[in-house]
Amino acid sequence: MAKYEKSMTGQFETVINRLHEDIMNSGLSMNMVDESNYAIGDTNIAVRVYDKYFMRNGSRASLSLTVVGHGNDIFVSAIGAGGGQGIVFNFSLGAESNMVAVVEESINRMG
């Protein structure tokens, strides 16, 4: 499992759209599995689940992305999981970390 969290300022829709675009452009086998959106008052919550096939270890890894916005305050949580091979030992060869790194790099480019 790999995890990245960041608090930042920005426009909620801009952040979620940019993250989605960067995640989807990170690999041909990237797939958005599902999404959920919720708003109450000035607070918006978006949850996205992605998965990607990794040829190097013959498995899929998932990325759970949660973005919470309240006004211009944004909180992003990205958790990568799966991607491992084996029953007893879970050798992922960094698949989860690669997916989380896409989110971190995207946020860094946003400033």
Briefly describe each language-model feature range.
Residues 1-27:
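Terminal, regulation- and interaction-focused segments at domain boundaries
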Residues 4-8, 46-52, 67:
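Short beta-strand element of the conserved SAM-dependent methyltransferase core
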Residues 10, 14, 60, 94, ...:
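Conserved active-site and cofactor/substrate-binding residues in soluble primary-metabolism enzymes
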Residues 18, 22-25, 29, 64, ...:
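Conserved mixed alpha/beta catalytic, RNA-binding, or beta-rich assembly cores of soluble enzyme
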Residues 20-63:
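Ser/Thr-rich, low-complexity intrinsically disordered terminal regions
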Residues 57-89:
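Beta-strand/loop substructures that line and gate deep hydrophobic ligand-binding cavities in soluble
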Residues 95-111:
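Well-ordered alpha/beta subsegment
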